[in-house]
Amino acid sequence: MKRPDYRTLQALDAVIRERGFERAAQKLCITQSAVSQRIKQLENMFGQPLLVRTVPPRPTEQGQKLLALLRQVELLEEEWLGDEQTGSTPLLLSLAVNADSLATWLLPALAPVLADSPIRLNLQVEDETRTQERLRRGEVVGAVSIQHQALPSCLVDKLGALDYLFVSSKPFAEKYFPNGVTRSALLKAPVVAFDHLDDMHQAFLQQNFDLPPGSVPCHIVNSSEAFVQLARQGTTCCMIPHLQIEKELASGELIDLTPGLFQRRMLYWHRFAPESRMMRKVTDALLDYGHKVLRQD
């Protein structure tokens, strides 16, 4: 069985994290040549490339598996060392999360863990349809995803659902929908998406109003919080989690444009198996809080 030297795995990890050999060398406090030699040693051991030499470099499928192995080893080392870690650098936990979870329930869920445990969070924001890929590539140790099936050597639990409402301000609704929300009126009403791959509003409008993708004017804004601001100021109509705008809906600052119609996104928590002691704390915190505030039906 091939047993890689974890120094060489750390070199591979550094090249990916630092997006190049030069910065990886600086991070590891070794020469760039030494980084190249360590990766070449790994590639010779496995008889195949582990990096695609693009700019920035990216791992091959085998490279992804090795990075995933490194993440598991780092977490298990923390558990094995236990109290001997006291006073050392806090453990780094890299998690892939969707922006709407980050803007609503995730940070309150993690508050007890952050208060009681010496950890550093590296929260990587990605669409919930793509977070699991970061776990597959070994970039993170846990992911909030809409995928219900676990990856090999991983665990998965249901967190609950976010219900997205199609909302706007009252002045916006009066301007664009004086006769109600209709297919023809929607063609002129600007919406907003998180990025070019965010298709939630397109799916909602196609399903309920038979509007094909790309038929309505759309802003691109990479911020969940900005969605709320844009809607409040009367700039757009948009899909926002009910959990994020409960106060605005109660006060009438925002209105549900299509009562009874919504998009539901069921979320799942994925992580490597076996779990370290610290990851078990994170899992318990996320599941406990998620089951309280997210839809469970």
Curated annotation (Swiss-Prot):
Belongs to the LysR transcriptional regulatory family. It comes from Escherichia coli (strain K12). Pfam families: HTH_1, LysR_substrate. One of its GO terms (molecular function) is DNA-binding transcription factor activity. Controls the transcription of genes involved in arginine and lysine metabolism. Activates transcription of several genes, including argO, lysP, lysC, asd, dapB, dapD, lysA, gdhA and argK. Acts by binding directly to their promoter or control region. ArgP dimer by itself is able to bind the argO promoter-operator region to form a binary complex, but the formation of a ternary complex with RNA polymerase is greatly stimulated only in presence of a coeffector. Both arginine and lysine are coeffectors at the argO promoter, but only arginine is competent to activate transcription. Homodimer. Keywords: Activator, DNA-binding, Transcription, Transcription regulation. Residues 4-60 form the HTH lysR-type domain. Signal peptide: none annotated. Specifically cleaved by the protease DegP. Cleaved ArgP can no longer interact with the oriC region in vitro. Cleavage may play an important role in the control of the protein availability. Residues 21-40 bind DNA. The keyword DNA-binding applies. Disruption phenotype: Null mutants are more sensitive to canavanine. InterPro entries: ArgP (IPR017685), ArgP_gammaproteobact (IPR023490), LTTR (IPR050176), LysR_subst-bd (IPR005119), Tscrpt_reg_HTH_LysR (IPR000847), WH-like_DNA-bd_sf (IPR036388), WH_DNA-bd_sf (IPR036390). PANTHER family: HTH-TYPE TRANSCRIPTIONAL REGULATOR ARGP (PTHR30579:SF2), TRANSCRIPTIONAL REGULATOR (PTHR30579). GO terms for biological process: negative regulation of DNA-templated DNA replication initiation; negative regulation of DNA-templated transcription; positive regulation of DNA-templated transcription; regulation of DNA-templated transcription. This is HTH-type transcriptional regulator ArgP.
